[in-house]
Each structure stands twice: as structure tokens, then as C-alpha cells.
């Protein structure tokens, strides 16, 4: 009997690990947030109404790119801008974002990482992330970038306007829309990250399963072998990584650091 119960729990855990993200208006904000947390773009518990700084947005861009697994290789040596020392939490992300041409510094040698990012700045950066060049746009900044972003769906469900500072909620939605949008070459951007994109839906399971370990059944005193960046309990974000006896769980030891737990049955 015990073996049969255990097999059932494992089957349940495997089933919930396959995550398909819908794009209906009723669920897209939660879907975008869960995707951002999973990719490490937004820390668990972040106030979604807070404005996003340029430094934080550089991290979000990198997290939604193929460079998200190479951040540690950047190291902490050297100063790219006079206001971004190598020891800054944003330094490796800013270095990647600038090297890839997604963001730029200012002529005075500063990056101004604590300045808030506006709608037009965010759209311009994401368009570059999708390999769009100025020659692909019509007009001048910022209207050309805003129009192109609207045309390819980056601004779907976004209500902010030109000049407005972007919040975490708005940035996660913008970047989630980028996964569904076509790049300059005409292919869905999410596909380049290993996601399956079909009919406006993004399936992240193919990426998450690569680094997933488990499922496991917790015993008395079981602890995760690391501190996870994000935790999901019964498909909902949780602030606690504590495991109870007979909990069924799986986790990823990649840079994402995601842990998911199914309550004991």
C-alpha cells in the first residue's frame, strides 16, 4: 500500500511540473510575474508597484535572454561606468546589456543605475533585445520605438504612456510579451530561449525540466540543499522553503534557483 501511495504522489508532482502559460487578459499579469520570478528577473516578494531602476531593468533584460546563465562569468573586476563599480549588484547585468547593445550609458561616463526606466526607454531596449535596428523603424525616438512596440505586441495590456516610469508589474508584462513577439528575423523570441511558443502561448516546461531534480518525498527534517530564489507551494508563490514530512517536491539547482512543492496528500 505504501508503494502505491508513493507512486501516486510522484505522478502528481510530475503532472504539476509541466507549466503551460496562457495569455488571456484575466491571467496574463500573474503569468508574466510567475515567468519573471522563474527566470530570476524579479525576486520573490518584490513590491510590484515599485518603479524599476535602470540597473534593475538591465538584470531583467539579461534574465530574459540567452545570457542569463553566464552572469557569474562576468566577475567583479573593473568599472564599466564611474557610477557602477565592479562590486555593484547590477554590474554584471549592466555589462552584458551594454555589450549587447540593449542599453547605453551617458556621455558623461555615467550609467545612472538608480534612475527609473521610462516606457520608451524600456521599449527601445526590448526592441534591441529582439534584434530590431533603427533601420527597421519608421520615424525618430521615441515615437518610432513606441509605435513598433505596439505593432509587434510588446505593449499588449500595458496602460502606461510615454514618459511614465515603469513599475515591476509593467516591466514583467512587457518582457513576457517579448517572449510571444517576433524578432526582426520573424521568429518568436521565446523560441530562441528554448521555450515553445504557439498561438500566443508560452510553454516553459522544456526549459524548466532541463535542470529539474526530483520529485522527492520529504522526510522528517528534510531541507533543501540550497536557499532557493523562488518557492512555489501548490502552484502559488510562497515565502517559506520549509518542507513538511511527506511533502512532494522538486527543485532546480540552476541560476534560476526555483523550488516547487506539493503539499502532502
Regions found by a protein language model. Name each.
Residues 2-58, 62-91, 100-120, 126-165, ...:
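Feature responds to low-complexity, polar/acidic, surface-exposed segments characteristic
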Residues 97:
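N-terminal cofactor/phosphate-binding cores enriched in small/glycine residues
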Residues 169:
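Surface-exposed binding/hinge segments that line
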Residues 176:
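Conserved redox-cofactor binding core of oxidoreductases
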Residues 235-249:
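Short nucleic-acid-contacting surface segments enriched for D/E, G, S/T with interspersed K/R
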Residues 247-254, 258-264:
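Repeat-associated, polar segments at repeat-unit boundaries in modular proteins
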Amino acid at each position: 500500500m505504501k508503494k502505491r501511495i508513493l507512486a501516486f504522489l510522484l505522478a502528481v508532482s510530475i503532472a504539476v511540473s509541466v507549466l503551460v502559460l496562457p495569455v488571456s487578459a484575466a491571467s496574463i499579469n500573474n503569468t508574466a510575474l510567475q515567468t519573471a520570478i522563474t527566470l530570476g528577473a524579479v525576486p520573490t516578494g518584490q513590491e510590484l508597484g515599485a518603479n524599476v531602476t535602470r540597473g534593475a531593468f538591465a538584470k531583467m533584460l539579461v534574465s530574459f535572454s540567452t545570457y542569463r546563465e553566464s552572469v557569474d562569468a562576468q566577475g567583479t573586476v573593473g568599472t564599466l561606468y564611474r557610477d557602477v563599480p565592479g562590486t555593484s549588484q547590477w554590474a554584471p547585468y549592466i555589462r552584458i546589456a551594454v555589450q549587447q547593445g540593449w542599453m547605453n550609458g551617458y556621455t558623461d561616463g555615467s550609467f545612472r543605475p538608480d534612475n527609473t526606466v521610462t516606457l520608451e526607454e524600456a521599449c527601445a531596449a526590448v526592441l534591441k533585445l529582439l534584434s530590431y535596428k533603427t533601420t527597421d523603424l519608421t520615424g525618430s525616438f521615441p515615437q518610432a520605438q513606441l509605435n513598433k512596440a505596439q505593432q509587434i505586441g510588446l505593449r499588449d495590456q500595458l496602460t502606461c504612456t510615454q514618459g511614465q516610469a515603469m513599475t515591476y508589474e509593467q516591466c514583467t508584462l512587457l518582457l513576457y510579451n517579448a517572449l510571444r513577439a517576433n524578432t526582426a528575423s520573424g521568429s518568436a523570441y521565446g523560441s530562441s530561449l528554448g521555450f515553445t511558443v504557439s498561438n500566443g502561448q508560452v510553454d516553459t516546461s522544456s526549459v524548466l525540466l532541463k535542470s529539474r531534480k526530483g520529485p522527492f518525498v520529504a522526510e522528517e527534517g528534510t531541507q533543501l540543499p540550497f536557499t532557493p530564489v523562488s518557492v512555489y507551494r501548490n502552484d502559488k508563490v510562497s515565502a517559506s522553503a520549509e518542507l513538511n514530512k511527506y511533502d512532494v517536491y522538486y527543485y532546480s539547482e540552476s541560476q534560476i534557483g526555483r523550488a516547487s512543492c506539493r503539499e502532502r496528500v
